[in-house]
């Protein structure tokens, strides 16, 4: 897949350039934001992901932060097999390093929602990945990309590490714009507890 140029070579650099799959080889059964952030994210999912819909939880882990809604199908993706096996919200999952291979093994228009929580800061080729998010979304499907100020700093790209929270909003919006085919992009901002809550929400239009 051709990479829409969003980040320069300098901007996509990481302090730790070793393979990501080695960094994530050991499972981490922790959450990467406080309870207030997670509660706000679950409420946003409840408001945006259609009930009985099909959801793709990209860059997931042992927990998806989805509400108790009975979705038709939930597919997860991540870098640690043990964590994904532990996630009881996933009907299906796969392991793939998106910095090595941006092509998702998923059908066109297969999902009503694509979710990416607390992980976008690690993408070195976000234009290509977001293009894939758009490809697997059905028409009028929703993309929800959430983040806070926490990260593994050695694995976050330079553009993210050096940006303010407002700058990070702009980065994610630029990823959506580079992918093409999205509209009605909005940013949800909140401060439920200590961790600031941000989410970029966009709709797929073919």
Where are these regions (language model features)?
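Class I SAM-dependent methyltransferase Rossmann-like catalytic core
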Residues: 2-50
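Class I SAM-dependent methyltransferase SAM/SAH-binding core
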Residues: 43, 47-104
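A short glycine-rich, Lys/Arg-flanked "PGG" loop and its adjoining helix->strand segment in the class I
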Residues: 127-142
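A short SAM/SAH-binding and catalytic strip from SAM-dependent methyltransferases
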Residues: 112-127
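Core SAM-dependent methyltransferase catalytic element
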Residues: 180-181, 189-206
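Conserved class I S-adenosyl-L-methionine
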Residues: 142-174
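A short acidic, Gly/Pro-enriched loop at the edge of an enzyme's catalytic core
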Residues: 101-114
């Amino acid at each position: 897949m051709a990479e829409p140029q969003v980040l320069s070579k300098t901007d996509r650099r990481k302090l730790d350039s070793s393979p990501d799959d080695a960094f994530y080889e050991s499972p981490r059964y922790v959450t990467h934001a406080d309870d207030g952030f997670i509660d706000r994210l679950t409420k946003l999912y409840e408001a945006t992901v259609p009930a009985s819909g099909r959801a793709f939880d990209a860059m997931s882990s042992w927990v998806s932060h989805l509400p108790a809604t009975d979705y038709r199908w939930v597919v997860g993706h991540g870098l640690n097999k043990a964590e994904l096996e532990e996630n009881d919200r996933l009907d299906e999952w796969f392991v793939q390093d998106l910095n090595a291979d941006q092509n998702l093994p998923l059908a066109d228009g297969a999902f009503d929602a694509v979710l990416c929580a607390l992980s976008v800061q690690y993408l070195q080729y976000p234009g290509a990945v977001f293009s894939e998010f758009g490809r697997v979304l059905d028409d009028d499907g929703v993309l929800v990309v959430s983040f806070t100020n926490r990260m593994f700093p050695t694995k976050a790209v330079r553009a993210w590490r050096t940006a303010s929270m407002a700058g990070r909003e702009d980065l994610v919006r630029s990823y959506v714009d580079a992918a093409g085919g999205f509209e009605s992009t909005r940013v949800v901002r909140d401060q439920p507890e200590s961790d600031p809550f941000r989410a970029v929400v966009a709709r797929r239009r073919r």
